[in-house]
Amino acid sequence: QAALILRIPVAHLHGGEITEGAYDDAIRHAITKMSNLHFTAAEPYRQRVIQMGEAPATVYNVGAVGLDHLLRNAPMPPDALAASLGFALHEPYFLVTYHPVTLAEEDPETSFRAMLAALDQFPDHQVILTYPNADNGGRAIIPILEDYARSRPDRVLAIPSLGFRRYLS
């Protein structure tokens, strides 16, 4: 908003995308309308930005720029990953990151508990649970997540964040 008022050019990455069930869309589209240059991740998103009234000459389909980061970072070997986690990791396992659906009718705790019940249907699988994001309902999920991991220490690891390389691994 300040950049718009002060006439500071803004370049927006990933405009035109849709996140169903989240208020991210309203924020993303507002940023699109305040931006001067638009770098979208795919042609349908480029078309959506143009449909929002932005000049086609200012909208570029450049792909998902974060994917380039994947090419520059090799995954960790499994033993190094396990050592960095302090968790004896073996296959099969699930890596689970749950973010609340911000516009859902159901409260996040109910949805999260249902997901944990589904994970219990796979007792031979280990589970790495990362904390939710900062969206509404995320904080309420953390104690549930920690209790779940605490009650299954040989099978479940709860961790606030893996960071990029461990998540990739």
List PLM regions with ranges:
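Alpha-helical scaffold segments in soluble metabolic enzymes
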Residues: 30-33, 48, 69, 114-118, ...
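Hydrophobic/aromatic beta-strand patches that form the interior of the parallel beta-sheet core
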Residues: 11, 39, 60, 128, ...
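Active-site and donor-binding regions of nucleotide-sugar-utilizing enzymes
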Residues: 1-56
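Short acidic loop-to-helix transition motifs that present clustered carboxylates
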Residues: 18-20, 45, 66, 162-166
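Donor-nucleotide binding loops and adjacent catalytic segments primarily
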Residues: 76-169
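Cofactor-binding loop segments of dinucleotide-utilizing enzymes, especially the Rossmann-like FAD-
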Residues: 15, 43, 64, 132-134, ...
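A nucleotide-sugar donor-handling region in carbohydrate enzymes
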Residues: 35-110
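Short secondary-structure transition/capping segments
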Residues: 22-26, 72-73, 140-141
